[in-house]
Design a protein with these regions (language model features):
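Conserved SGNH/GDSL esterase-like catalytic core that processes O-acyl groups on lipids
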Residues: 1-66, 72, 84-93, 97
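A structural micro-motif
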Residues: 8, 75, 106-108
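Residue-level recognition of beta-strand->loop/alpha-helix junctions
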Residues: 14, 81, 112-114
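A structural signal for isolated positions on well-ordered beta-strands in alpha/beta enzyme cores
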Residues: 41, 76-78, 109
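Surface-exposed aromatic
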Residues: 44, 79-83, 124-128
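Secondary-structure boundary elements
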Residues: 70-71, 105
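A non-catalytic structural micro-motif
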Residues: 72-79, 114
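Catalytic His-Asp segment of secreted/periplasmic serine-dependent ester chemistry enzymes
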Residues: 86-150
Length: 150
C-alpha cells in the first residue's frame, strides 16, 4: 500500500503497530513542520482497540486532529474509520459511527473504507486479511481502490 499512497502524491507517515499516542509524539517532535500539506488522511486507532475504551479512542483522535489542524491549518483532512477486526466487527462499527460524528464536528471529512472489508455476513472477509487484523495484498488493494486517496 505504501507505494500506492506515495504514487498518489501523499507522504506516508504511518508505521506498523502505531497507536494514536505514537502519532502525537511524532507530531510534537516536528513531523508536520516545514511544509504545507494540501490534503491529509488520518488512518489511525486500530491498534488502540483492546487497550483503550471507545471513548478514549474517539477523544484521542479528536485531540490528534486538533494538533494536525494547528500545524497544517490549510490542509483538507479526511479521517478514515477503523478497519474491522475478527471478532470485533460490531464494536468497530459502533466506534466508527462515533468517529464519523467527531470528524464532522471538527470540520473533517470521514470515509468508512472498512465496510469494504466485510463479507455479506457482516464478519470480516477472511480472504482480505493475513490474521483477522492485518490486511494482505488483496485487502490493501481494496483500501487503495476505496476512494481513500481521492
Amino acid at each position: 500500500m505504501r507505494g500506492d499512497v506515495e504514487s498518489a502524491g501523499y507522504l506516508n507517515l504511518g508505521y506498523s503497530s502505531d497507536r494514536i499516542e505514537n502519532v502525537l509524539w511524532r507530531i510534537y517532535h516536528g513531523e508536520l513542520d516545514g511544509y504545507q500539506a494540501e490534503k491529509i488522511v488520518v488512518m489511525i486507532g486500530t491498534n488502540n482497540l483492546g487497550i483503550h475504551s471507545a471513548e478514549e479512542i474517539v477523544d484521542g483522535l479528536e485531540f490528534l486532529l486538533k494538533q494536525i489542524q494547528i500545524r497544517q491549518p490549510k490542509a483538507k483532512i479526511k479521517v478514515a474509520g477503523l478497519f474491522p477486526r475478527k471478532g470485533m466487527e460490531s464494536d468497530v462499527k459502533k466506534l466508527n459511527k462515533q468517529i464519523s460524528k467527531m470528524a464532522a464536528r471538527n470540520g473533517c471529512d470521514y470515509i468508512d473504507v472498512g465496510k469494504k472489508l466485510l463479507a455479506k455476513s457482516g464478519k470480516i472477509d477472511e480472504k482480505l486479511f493475513v490474521d483477522g487484523q492485518r490486511l494482505n495484498d488483496k485487502g490493501d488493494a481494496v483500501i487503495v481502490g476505496s476512494g481513500l486517496l481521492d
